[in-house]
């Protein structure tokens, strides 16, 4: 057994008919953990329903449907490997809660594959003012997905026919747009692909192929393998948002969550925000195994001394008492992008915020300024209202105690989705937090240390 490959999480984004599902399905099909038998079954069903041309998308739809019906699909199906990395596709659009998931991210994406349709008319629709290509690229950047690969898909379409001119035209347009969003276009590979034929997905196109005659760059899999290894924030102070709190007979209170930054280890004294309670960690476990320590990305349960289950809740944040412990907030300022709200938003609007594992109503107490959503330049001070498509700096006040952080310091605790009318109305990034000092309880074991 060699050294374990580094894990990289991918999110696949792009306009509705760009061929995302076919491309993703094909990737998983070729490199992933789907059993041959399951694929053959899907192929047969697709053919019977006259959907032969959708066979790879069909694979993905089947997986998604099962996932949405709550049948837990072996997550290995969504994994595939390259020479250097082990990739997991953590989400593909088409999921109802895609945007919310992308923000509160059960796991944060390290890399985005932006799939665009190359045929004339289709590409233009995706990149138009209200096209999803724009929306998704902007979201990915706003939410801190640092690396991107563009798949110029549907190159096999009869109106493209592997044309170098069309590829260059589309690439140039994408570069202009990605630069506006904030990416460095020179660092974003544009890979011509066909999700349907599989051309240039897994291996470089043959020189005799219409594409191979002019394209000499990497295939999609190589481009993925060439990505920079993600840096994990081990050296930051501990932040661990609680997903659940259990009471386990004979053991006691066990909070559960994912370490976002820093390390947690037995013997450490931790503080929970927003309540300010401090106690000692007795043990840390992952998959029923005791660990000497756990770091970013680890989903763990940890046992705490002399703390009742009633004292801790989902959405609380655990941190190291001696190293920048987390605190509740009185208010915070955030840059908010309104995605889809049917009316006008005024000061006093109070939707629900999903930030890390917290789900709390927050009031837009003050609209500070309206800004250009791409350049960040100020457009007007204290606007009367904001609406879909606007970006604004807003002062927010939570309806009950909550713990959030500035995005620059602790990214996973500094981005949020605004939910209203059962959809994601806006996304936000927290710029600054006004902390609230509380006299928290300290258990005996914490006081001793």
Swiss-Prot record:
tr-type G domain boundaries: 5-234
Task: Provide the residue span(s) of the region labelled G1.
Answer: 14-21
Q: Which domain of life is it from?
A: Eukaryota
Write the record's keywords in alphabetical order, separated by commas.
Cytoplasm, Elongation factor, GTP-binding, Methylation, Nucleotide-binding, Protein biosynthesis
Q: Does the keyword Cytoplasm apply?
A: yes
- A Pfam family recorded for this sequence: GTP_EFTU_D2
GO function terms (MF aspect): GTP binding; GTPase activity; translation elongation factor activity
Query: Which residue stretches belong to region G2?
Result: 70-74
- Say what the protein does: This protein promotes the GTP-dependent binding of aminoacyl-tRNA to the A-site of ribosomes during protein biosynthesis.
- Family membership, please give it: Belongs to the TRAFAC class translation factor GTPase superfamily. Classic translation factor GTPase family. EF-Tu/EF-1A subfamily.
Please give the residue ranges the record annotates as the region G5.
194-196
According to the UniProt record, list the residues that bear N6,N6,N6-trimethyllysine.
Answer: 79, 187, 310, 400
Region of interest (G3), residue spans: 91-94
The signal peptide here is none
Segments of this protein annotated with the region G4: 153-156
Modified positions (N6-methyllysine) in chain numbering = 265
Recorded hits in NCBIfam families, A to Z, give: EF-1_alpha, PRK12317.1
Q: List the disulfide bonds.
A: none
Q: Which residues bind GTP?
A: 14-21, 91-95, 153-156
This chain belongs to the protein called Elongation factor 1-alpha
A GO CC term?
cytoplasm
Q: Which organism is it from?
A: Pyropia yezoensis
Q: Which Gene3D superfamilies match?
A: P-loop containing nucleotide triphosphate hydrolases (3.40.50.300), Translation factors (2.40.30.10)
Q: Where in the cell is it found?
A: Cytoplasm
Q: Which residues carry this modification: N6,N6-dimethyllysine?
A: 55
Task: Output the HAMAP family linked to this UniProt entry.
Answer: EF_Tu_A (MF_00118_A)
